[in-house]
Curated annotation (Swiss-Prot):
Catalyzes the isomerization between 2-isopropylmalate and 3-isopropylmalate, via the formation of 2-isopropylmaleate. InterPro entries: 3-IsopropMal_deHydase_ssu (IPR004431), Aconitase/3IPM_dehydase_swvl (IPR015928), AconitaseA/IPMdHydase_ssu_swvl (IPR000573), IPMI_Swivel (IPR033940), LeuD (IPR050075). GO terms for cellular component: 3-isopropylmalate dehydratase complex. This is 3-isopropylmalate dehydratase small subunit. Keywords: Amino-acid biosynthesis, Branched-chain amino acid biosynthesis, Leucine biosynthesis, Lyase.
């Protein structure tokens, strides 16, 4: 009963953005939070860094560079997703095309928002992130908790609850429905 697309192994193109303390307002400025659905936020992700004042692409912003176009794995700095607890930041990154974000650390709420939106947040040390950023593509194996370049693998930690949800494609509703018979039994006992 998968409610979201399961993540087991994933191979994707990377883009490095090694800034520390990227907050949710930098990910999706509050001026763009007027939508009522989860989609349509991608064009506004990193809006103030991504575009020049005239609206054209900023050629110095890594995700705009030709070698990083189509990247689905973001490798970034420490304390990613800090600031206000807007879930729109996760929606914007997902809508932009990211499936995996590798950082030195995450805001707790942002980390949870990623997992709730079928994105895998991975915490790795700086030397591992710098090594992985040298490659065009890397591979993530969630069941074995590894991130691999062609020549090296790095182990990462993830809470078993989040891992189970992502590997099995379960959102909160799907998890609740797994206990439907127990819930009904309890309700009848009242």
């Amino acid at each position: 009963m998968a409610a979201i697309k399961p993540i087991t192994t994933y191979k994707g193109k990377i883009v490095p953005l090694f800034n520390d303390n990227i907050d949710t307002d930098q990910i999706i400025p509050k001026v763009h939070l007027k939508r009522i659905s989860k989609s349509g936020f991608g064009p506004f992700a990193f809006d103030e860094w991504r575009y020049l004042p005239d609206g054209s692409d900023n050629p110095d912003f890594n995700p705009n560079k030709p070698q990083y176009k189509g990247a689905s794995i973001l490798i970034t700095g420490d304390n990613f997703g800090c600031g206000s607890s807007r879930e729109h930041a996760a929606w914007a990154l997902k809508d932009y095309g990211f499936h995996i974000i590798i950082a030195g650390s995450f805001s707790d709420i942002f980390y949870m928002n990623c997992t709730k939106n079928a994105m895998l947040p991975i915490v790795l040390e700086k030397n591992a992130r710098e090594h992985l950023a040298k490659y065009v593509e890397i591979e993530v194996d969630l069941p074995n908790q590894t991130v691999s370049s062609p020549d090296k693998s790095f182990h990462f930690e993830i809470d078993e609850t989040w891992k189970n949800k992502l590997v099995n494609g379960l959102d909160d509703i799907a998890i609740t429905l797994q206990y439907e018979s127990l819930i009904e039994k309890y309700e009848k006992s009242l």
